């Protein structure tokens, strides 16, 4: 199986969350079908055609785009689906941009997996992060996605403004009830060019220590995996954009954040097993 990534930086996202700098990075760029086609072509020479291959739209809230632009971006992917080069499509979006009409459009273009940027299910935390939606939007979106038969992934965060460890634990309990197929876990970092950078500089926000971020992420990881929910990533990708000089202002950065989280999870599991 090969996942062919297609990046549409910040496309379709109407809000500037306090921790996000994508508007600063990508400006007002608009994705096009030609952009998608060029990105796909970079990978096609390296993969064997087959139904297990998947095109994946990353970096924006895809269903927040106008329907005609979504259709345009799907055009190169539709061709690969028709030719049998790939078998499905996945994408990420906001929970408040899920409705029946949008999901019918996704189904018409081979989308089988939808990831929701949830971050937290605590309305106070969502408001502090200026997410622009509430927890009820997540519950409605997951319910509708299940009705339409999509595989569902949820993206979660620890260390957000106004987010205590108890808040994280409460979010996890709600996630277990929602029952997604998989999840990602990210520690919040203070990134250059974000509103959170200014909040941090004013002394109004204190990020988690690395130790605390590992502890909280390991808790989330353990709860999810023990419930049969696969955690497909822990920590941000340590790429050039993130790790460039001065880009990380503060916060619990580790280039392989998943490793100490996995170790903490395994150590706790072994301790419980021998009690």
Name each model-derived stretch.
Residues 25-38, 44-46, 58-184, 188-214:
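Conserved non-cysteine loop/helix-boundary elements of the Radical SAM core domain that shape
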Residues 13-17, 191-197, 242-244:
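Short acidic/His/Gly/Ser-rich catalytic and metal-binding motifs that mark active-site loops
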Residues 221, 225, 232-234:
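Helix-loop elements that line ligand-binding/catalytic pockets
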Residues 1-35:
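Canonical Radical SAM [4Fe-4S] cluster-binding loop centered on the CxxxCxxC motif
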